[in-house]
């Protein structure tokens, strides 16, 4: 059976349009708030409201999928995000935008859980690495194109909201021409997220998603600040961030294929070791281009490989709950990691960014090496 089936291709096509809309809004909302002369703490609280919505959406989506299936859950998630987009134009104010960004956060997280769970359930233990690699490539390409759109079109609020809302609704169209089957058995009891987080044989995958959240959250949020403090111009910062993200895009497919062929444990060990090497190279401040490239290629591909590792340790009917647990773990890591790292950078040195990334990666590498002889046979084959 082909890895990239018609439902998978149509699902990823819809996701590309949704990711474009998400990237544009996430970039422009803080700027719009600043234009309304809102204080820094208000901008921060509105951003936190969005991420709080992410957490709530992650927790709710498993129940929604079980009740109405993948297709209708995807439509619902898209409509919720579209409402969060359009609502920004109804009333411009702190409390109004606090509420609408929460709604958008819920819809965004629901989209991620639905798409990731559908891909997990569509694949087998032999091709999930490639499916998740394709998913991450679409996500990063959509994010890149979204940034490109921001630089080429008018960024006025009432100019952007109509076409961003339209993009979100257009993301529904591909799924109208196919049906993603919900293959969870009806005779199984509902699986809780907590039980998945506690599952011993999947712990390396859960921990890997937390580490991935810390690494990517820190790189996304703090790398521009690090470069700025080193005297790099804004234009050059954009170039170096493009190098980082491009490396992540280029690394997805080959690493996903290697994980399917040689096993995810081996690939995870190599990835984490390369992240440590890239961090050390950045600290040495020699040859920043190759250092950033290998850091991006290894760091940005941790999440899909760790996710595939965890999902092959559970039964098929547990995949949606496991995916929720993994996305929740990633979100927690991406929230806590940058906050703690930023405090260290402010009080000590900007170099703590890469020391922190190398340290958490080293701890995870020890976990991976410790489990050398404990690799139970995958159970989610079908």
From Swiss-Prot:
<dbReference type="InterPro" id="IPR020846">
    <property type="entry name" value="MFS_dom"/>
</dbReference>
<dbReference type="InterPro" id="IPR011701">
    <property type="entry name" value="MFS"/>
</dbReference>
<feature type="transmembrane region" description="Helical">
    <location>
        <begin position="291"/>
        <end position="311"/>
    </location>
</feature>
<feature type="transmembrane region" description="Helical">
    <location>
        <begin position="157"/>
        <end position="177"/>
    </location>
</feature>
<feature type="transmembrane region" description="Helical">
    <location>
        <begin position="235"/>
        <end position="255"/>
    </location>
</feature>
<feature type="transmembrane region" description="Helical">
    <location>
        <begin position="348"/>
        <end position="368"/>
    </location>
</feature>
<feature type="transmembrane region" description="Helical">
    <location>
        <begin position="14"/>
        <end position="34"/>
    </location>
</feature>
<protein>
    <recommendedName>
        <fullName>Uncharacterized MFS-type transporter YcaD</fullName>
    </recommendedName>
</protein>
<feature type="transmembrane region" description="Helical">
    <location>
        <begin position="131"/>
        <end position="151"/>
    </location>
</feature>
<feature type="transmembrane region" description="Helical">
    <location>
        <begin position="325"/>
        <end position="345"/>
    </location>
</feature>
<feature type="transmembrane region" description="Helical">
    <location>
        <begin position="79"/>
        <end position="99"/>
    </location>
</feature>
<feature type="transmembrane region" description="Helical">
    <location>
        <begin position="102"/>
        <end position="122"/>
    </location>
</feature>
<feature type="transmembrane region" description="Helical">
    <location>
        <begin position="270"/>
        <end position="290"/>
    </location>
</feature>
<dbReference type="GO" id="GO:0005886">
    <property type="term" value="C:plasma membrane"/>
</dbReference>
<feature type="transmembrane region" description="Helical">
    <location>
        <begin position="204"/>
        <end position="224"/>
    </location>
</feature>
<keyword id="KW-0997">Cell inner membrane</keyword>
<keyword id="KW-0472">Membrane</keyword>
<keyword id="KW-1133">Transmembrane helix</keyword>
<dbReference type="GO" id="GO:0022857">
    <property type="term" value="F:transmembrane transporter activity"/>
</dbReference>
<dbReference type="InterPro" id="IPR036259">
    <property type="entry name" value="MFS_trans_sf"/>
</dbReference>
<dbReference type="InterPro" id="IPR023745">
    <property type="entry name" value="MFS_YcaD"/>
</dbReference>
<dbReference type="InterPro" id="IPR047200">
    <property type="entry name" value="MFS_YcaD-like"/>
</dbReference>
<feature type="transmembrane region" description="Helical">
    <location>
        <begin position="45"/>
        <end position="65"/>
    </location>
</feature>
<comment type="similarity">
    <text>Belongs to the major facilitator superfamily. YcaD (TC 2.A.1.26) family.</text>
</comment>
<keyword id="KW-0812">Transmembrane</keyword>
<keyword id="KW-0813">Transport</keyword>
<keyword id="KW-1003">Cell membrane</keyword>
<dbReference type="Pfam" id="PF07690">
    <property type="entry name" value="MFS_1"/>
</dbReference>
């Amino acid at each position: 059976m082909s890895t990239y089936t018609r439902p998978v291709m149509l699902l990823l096509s819809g996701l590309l349009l949704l990711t474009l809309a998400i990237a544009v809004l996430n970039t422009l909302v803080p700027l719009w708030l600043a234009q309304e002369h809102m204080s820094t703490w208000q901008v921060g609280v509105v951003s936190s409201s969005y991420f709080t919505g992410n957490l709530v959406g992650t927790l709710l989506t498993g129940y929604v999928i079980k009740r109405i299936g993948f297709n209708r859950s995807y439509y619902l998630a898209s409509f919720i995000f579209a409402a969060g987009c359009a609502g920004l134009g109804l009333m411009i104010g702190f409390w109004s935008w606090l509420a609408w960004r929460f709604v958008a956060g819920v819809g965004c997280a629901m989209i991620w859980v639905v798409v990731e769970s559908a891909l997990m359930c569509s694949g087998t233990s032999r091709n999930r690495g490639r499916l998740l690699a394709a998913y991450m490539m679409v996500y990063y390409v959509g994010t890149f194109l979204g940034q490109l759109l921001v630089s080429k079109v008018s960024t006025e609020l009432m100019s952007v909201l109509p076409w961003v809302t339209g993009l979100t609704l257009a993301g529904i169209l591909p799924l109208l021409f196919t049906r993603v089957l919900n293959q969870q058995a009806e005779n199984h009891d509902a699986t809780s997220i907590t039980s998945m987080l506690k599952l011993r044989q999947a712990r390396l995958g859960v921990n890997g998603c937390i580490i991935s959240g810390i690494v990517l959250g820190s790189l996304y949020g703090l790398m521009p600040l690090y470069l700025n403090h080193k005297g790099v111009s804004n234009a050059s910062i954009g170039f170096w961030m493009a190098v980082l993200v491009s490396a992540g895009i280029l690394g997805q497919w080959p690493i996903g294929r290697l994980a399917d062929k040689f096993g995810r444990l081996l690939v995870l060990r190599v990835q984490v070791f390369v992240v440590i090497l890239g961090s050390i190279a950045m600290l040495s401040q020699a040859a920043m281009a190759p250092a950033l490239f290998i850091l991006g290629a290894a760091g940005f591909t941790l999440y899909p490989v760790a996710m595939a590792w965890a999902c092959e340790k559970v039964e098929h009917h547990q995949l949606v709950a496991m995916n929720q647990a993994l996305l929740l773990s990633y979100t927690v890591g991406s929230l806590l990691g940058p906050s703690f790292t930023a405090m260290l950078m402010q009080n000590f040195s900007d170099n703590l960014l890469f020391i922190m990334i190398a340290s958490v990666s080293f701890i995870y590498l020890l976990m991976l090496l410790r489990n050398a002889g404990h690799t139970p046979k995958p159970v989610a084959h079908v």
